[in-house]
């Protein structure tokens, strides 16, 4: 038997094993593909046709657990909706939305290259990288939006909320925003516990002024960076 029949490229083998992946290359290059338990990042590497090739099981993203908690707490239905995830980063919120049944998620982030490869390849995800919240319009999101999630650094929820009004937001839409007290209050470091209520009040006022109603909040089940206390704010549009 010839060598070419016994060996195939890693890329070809992964396509055979996982035809659901539209583009396996990002998974390979990020070290998510294992050959006999060892990460291989060269898509042209020759592997035995009967070799053990597997996708690495990825740890849940922190944002995933945060969003799951608030969706459950406030009874936010996601099945079949169109959502915009502002500050998508690695995609914790985006993943949670898809897992809950969202039909489409616009994953918006000012940076680039952070979103997990599996999410990039998902046909339900529209990736809008290098896109600041101030640039969001119906030209970028040409659909009516049912849910907006916000997880931003260096910008308060109060400042972010009015910038969302350039989108076509349904009257039945919901908003979920992660309140980071340090950024909400414009502080150089983590605020004292007695300032946390001020941060929540600031975010709530900004959201209400931007046209949302019935704001309610909960403490995030997971701390932020450096152990920072964070809160999840939920509000309705109509």
Regions found by a protein language model. Give the residues of each.
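A basic, amphipathic helix-loop patch mediating RNA/tRNA/ribosome contacts
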Residues: 1-49, 82
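Conserved alpha-helix/loop element of class I SAM-dependent methyltransferases that forms part
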Residues: 62-81
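Conserved SAM-binding loop of SAM-dependent methyltransferases across substrates and taxa
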Residues: 90-101
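S-adenosyl-L-methionine
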Residues: 106-159
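Conserved beta-strand signature within the Rossmann-like core of class I S-adenosyl-L-methionine
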Residues: 171-186
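Conserved S-adenosyl-L-methionine
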Residues: 212-222
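Core SAM-dependent methyltransferase catalytic element
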Residues: 222-238
């Amino acid at each position: 038997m010839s060598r070419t029949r016994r060996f195939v490229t890693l890329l070809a083998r992964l396509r055979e094993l996982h035809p659901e992946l539209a583009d396996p290359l990002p998974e390979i290059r990020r070290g998510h593909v294992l050959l006999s338990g060892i990460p291989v990042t060269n898509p042209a590497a020759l592997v035995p046709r009967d070799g053990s090739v597997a996708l690495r099981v990825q740890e849940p993203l922190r944002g995933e657990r945060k969003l799951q908690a608030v969706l459950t707490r406030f009874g936010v239905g996601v099945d079949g909706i169109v959502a915009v995830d502002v500050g998508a980063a690695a995609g914790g919120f985006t993943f949670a939305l898809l897992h809950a049944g969202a039909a489409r998620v616009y994953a918006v982030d000012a940076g680039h290259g952070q979103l997990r490869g599996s999410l990039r390849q998902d046909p339900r995800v529209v990736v809008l990288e290098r896109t600041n919240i101030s640039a969001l319009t119906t030209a970028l999101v040409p659909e009516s939006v049912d849910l907006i999630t916000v997880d931003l650094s260096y910008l308060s929820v109060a400042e972010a909320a009015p910038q969302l009004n350039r989108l076509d937001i349904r009257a039945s839409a919901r908003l979920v925003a992660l309140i980071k007290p340090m950024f909400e209050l414009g502080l150089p470091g983590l605020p004292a516990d007695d300032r946390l209520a001020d941060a929540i009040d600031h975010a709530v006022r900004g959201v209400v002024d931007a046209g949302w109603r019935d704001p309610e909040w909960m403490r995030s089940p997971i701390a932020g960076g450096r152990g920072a206390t964070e809160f999840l704010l939920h509000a309705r549009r109509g």
